[in-house]
Amino acid sequence: MREAAERRQQLELEHEQALAFLNAKQQEIQLLQQAQVEAKKEHEGAVQLLESKVRELEEKCRVQSEQFNLLSRDLEKFRQHTGSIDLLGSSSVALLDVPLAPGKPFPQYMNGLATSIHKGHEGPTGHYSVIGDYIPLSGDKLESPCVKPSFLLRSSSPRCRFESEMDNDRNSNNSKQSSSGKVHLCVARYSYNPFDGPNENPEAELPLTAGKYLYVYGDMDEDGFYEGELLDGQRGLVPSNFVDFIQDNESRLAGTLGSEQDQNFLNHSGISLERDSILHLHSPTQVDSGITDNGGGTLDVNIDDIGEDTVPYPRKITLIKQLAKSVIVGWEPPAVPPGWGTVSSYNVLVDKETRMSLALGRRTKALIEKLNTAACTYRISVQCVTSRGNSDELQCTLLVGKDVVVAPSQLRVDNITQISAQLSWLPTNSNYSHIIFLNEEELDIVKAARYKYQFFNLRPNMAYKVKVLAQPHQMPWQLPLEQREKKEACVEFSTLPAGPPAPPQDVTVHAGATAASVQVSWKPPALTPTGLSNGANVTGYGVYAKGQRVAEVIAPTADGTAVELIRLRSLEAKAVSVRTLSVQGESMDSALAAIPPDLLVPPAPHPRTAPPPKPLASDMDTKDQHLGPHVKVDESWEQSRSPGPAHGHMLEPPDMHSAGPGRRSPSPSRILPQPQGAPVSTTVAKAMAREAAQRVAESNRLEKRSLFLEQSSAGQYTNSDEEDGYASPEVKRRGTSVDDFLKGSELGKQPHCCHGDEYHTESSRGSDLSDIMEEDEEELYSEMQLEDGGRRRPSGTSHNALKILGNSTLMGRADRMEHVSRRYSHSGGGSHRHRPAMAPSIDEYTGRDHLSPDFYDESETDPGAEELPARIFVALFDYDPLTMSPNPDAAEEELPFKEGQIIKVYGDKDADGFYRGETCARLGLIPCNMVSEIHADDEEMMDQLLRQGFLPLNTPVEKIERSRRSGRGHSVPTRRMVALYDYDPRESSPNVDVEAELPFCTGDIITVFGEIDEDGFYYGELNGQKGLVPSNFLEEVPDDVEVHLSDAPPHYSHDPPMRSKAKRKKSVHFTP
């Protein structure tokens, strides 16, 4: 029982202990439950707090999206207001038709835009390589891409800006852009750390990273800074020459990749525009598809780096495992823009041979077998197969096997010009970026998956060494150490020597500032910052019409100049071209620009102020004073490009290269053309006989001429109030050109002057002007006619006339060019006393100290002279009243004119020696000693001369006379001749006035008048048209053909000795 009681007590004690332990456990459980509840509450509170923060962030995101959309709408409105932006460079054009996929949101485009533009690097010698940094998205002028701007200084007084000329142009464009809106989106052109700059408060400026976007507000301040804001909200000052404005969403950037299929020579991402927009690049050569941009070698390819015409390519190819007989490679899918197209599969290639094709969606890995990596090297490539073609295999490639190194292989330089070249290579791994060195100086970095590079702004005829250094994205541990260390490859090349510059573009012709000129405009060719085009130093531009330079401007950047209409009309030019002038020569002609027809029509002449003329008895006798209807001007008065022979008579064609362009051919002025085809022996024999006969005739004429001059020099002059009179038989003289006449009369030689008591002066209006002597000049357009008697001079002063002795036809043809060259020289030695009106002295313009009158016409005064109609004069010299006239009112009262210009004159000259004349629809005064009269007795002849506008001074007088005689009813022998060859003067004639010659075909029968002239030409008629025909193209009609020939020798009727003739008048200013 005792044991049972002890047992029971023990059990109760254990029970109590168990209850106590249980209570303790229960309390512990309660504490744990309470802690759990508290932890749950705390968790719920934290979750609620996080949820509220998330809601706040979402709200901020929504607000920012709305702000961004608002800015996008503002940009769109701005684009609509300003219109499409014309980004025309000054030369070659790169057309980018690579728009983004339709429907792609602009914010999505902006998210990746920052990766597509990067900083450029300056070349070793001031030359800059790629045009990718050269994307001016605003303004009209483009400048060199790679010149890094100098810092802008902000100071209280004075404010200084040190910018290059290029950046000044850009900033001026930027200021125009910034003034048209409140907020503008910009992209940083260069990286900028304010603390490295020269300004005292760098904390007020924003740090910039090349290619990143930012906003600017308002206008640029006077120091050249904008107030800007980065995309992260940071605000501050932004230097204007470190940013580029983004015009609108048309200027979207998209990557364009180098591919052999589309000949894309560029090595970086490019700009993509919508399909209706074109980007014009300012570069010496045309680039096909994009603008290069310098990247840093990242492996991440943004969707926006894929252009519309670029096939997306696989990315990040990796060598997973390399075995003795096989390799395993992997890659990532391509970045395909929405709506671009579909990618159906991948092709895996080994040395350009397709080994397998994997469907899209399967694992992007491939096991390539049947390789011998221990003994051979293989190029593994992966390309995408899409609905728009396959991607470029070199954009996803790597080398495996034996002797693989990091350095690229097969460096090549192609498309070498004077200032550009294209570099290409094969990368060891498409994930590698590459650093380009030019002449041992780092030039640029080419991003991954690019293997081509374009050099620009190189120097002509210079040797370059290019080094390409590969930069692996990660260390290729699978390669041995010595193969890993081989990272660079080199190539050398030389640019071409400087060649002729490029011609201007877009040549146009429109009305000029005055009625007497037209404005020719063009777009200059692309010039480097140093003013080179194709390596040639551009100096200016020349305007050409029918191969002759009619205007010139010396300015490399000129885009237009004025051209005198008189020159164009005298050449009968319908179009003009422009050439670029340089030290190395002229460029090719630009595209022809048509001259508007309304500008070429001469203005209608003013109504005549003189009363109708009275009929004169001698009117019918002055027909011989007319210019022939076939004598026209086909070249400029200023220069003639037709060369001529050095001797007087020749039937064989002269050497066409004996005289350079721009020279007037010595007399005779007409050159016999060369017939094309087999010569006819009889024709040659007859031509030689005619030439011999001409020499004999010429010798006789010279003897008679010499005899006449001796007789005339021995004659006595009339004194008192009578004009000079001559008595001599008629002498048939050889044809002398108008230029020879002028040379023999006023300019040809130093005259024999009478000084002292032998010379008496006459005054005009009491002025002390050097006397204007007035005599009748023997008319050289007709046979020399000596007449007795004369008329009384209006002045009572008597004087002795001065004459030049010698044969004007023989007076130094060799020095004729010298005469032409010095005709425009100005001595500047004479002093003038300004009077109300003065006639300029000839000696001012010819560089001679003394000049006397030479030949004067002998004519009679008609009582009705004041009622004569308007007369036609030809200018003997160039005359510009502004620079050559001593009169103070010259600019308003006197008319300018050019040598050889036809001038319409009303009435007689006044007491001061001035005519009242009209040129270019303008009335004014004409100095009488600068012009010479040409008589035209009928309206048709006068109208023809006025329409012609110019009379070439090398027009042979005998041919003018012959043309005149052809219209008179004199008895002239005629013959019929057959043409042996086809002849078109405009194509075959070496002469200037091709309109004076007749075209004909083989077998045509031509009626010729008179004998052959000293130049080897007949005057003939064909199909009602009259003109000159070359004798060596003709043969007389055989005897068995019926022809009517005159047996009488050719002759011309002469006027009776005492017949009154209307003479040319000319006043010469004489300085004793």
Swiss-Prot record:
Where is the PTM Phosphoserine found along the chain?
A: S720, S728, S852, S859
The alphabetized UniProt keywords are:
Cell membrane, Membrane, Phosphoprotein, Repeat, SH3 domain, Synapse
Fibronectin type-III domain: residues covered: 311-404, 407-489, 503-604
The Basic and acidic residues compositionally biased stretches are 620-635, 730-743, 754-765
Q: Which InterPro entries match?
A: FN3_dom (IPR003961), FN3_sf (IPR036116), Ig-like_fold (IPR013783), RIM-BP_SH3_2 (IPR035753), RIM-BP_SH3_3 (IPR035755), RIMBP1/2/3 (IPR040325), SH3-like_dom_sf (IPR036028), SH3_domain (IPR001452)
Q: Which GO terms describe its cellular component?
A: calyx of Held; glutamatergic synapse; plasma membrane; presynaptic active zone cytoplasmic component
Which cysteine pairs are joined by S-S bonds?
none
| Gene Ontology MF annotations | structural constituent of presynaptic active zone; voltage-gated calcium channel activity involved in regulation of presynaptic cytosolic calcium levels; voltage-gated monoatomic ion channel activity involved in regulation of presynaptic membrane potential
Sequence ranges assigned to domain SH3 in this UniProt record = 181-248, 868-936, 972-1039
UniProt-listed SMART domains? FN3, SH3
| Extent of Acidic residues compositional bias | 771-781
Basic residues: compositionally biased ranges? 1060-1072
- What is the role of this chain? Plays a role in the synaptic transmission as bifunctional linker that interacts simultaneously with RIMS1, RIMS2, CACNA1D and CACNA1B.
Transmembrane region positions?
A: none
Q: Where is this region: Disordered?
A: 597-681, 713-800, 1044-1072
Subunit? Interacts with RIMS1, RIMS2, CACNA1D and CACNA1B, and potentially with other Ca(2+) channel alpha-1 isoforms.
Sequence similarity: Belongs to the RIMBP family.
Biased composition range(s): Pro residues:
599-615
In the record's own words, the domains note is: The SH3 domains mediate binding to a proline-rich motif in RIMS1, RIMS2, CACNA1D and CACNA1B.
- Residues recorded as bearing Phosphothreonine in the entry: T861
Annotated GO biological process? regulation of calcium-dependent activation of synaptic vesicle fusion; regulation of presynaptic membrane potential
Natural source organism: Mus musculus
Quote the subcellular location field of this record. Answer: Cell membrane; Synapse
- According to UniProt, the name of this protein is RIMS-binding protein 2
Composition skew (Low complexity), residue ranges: 660-670
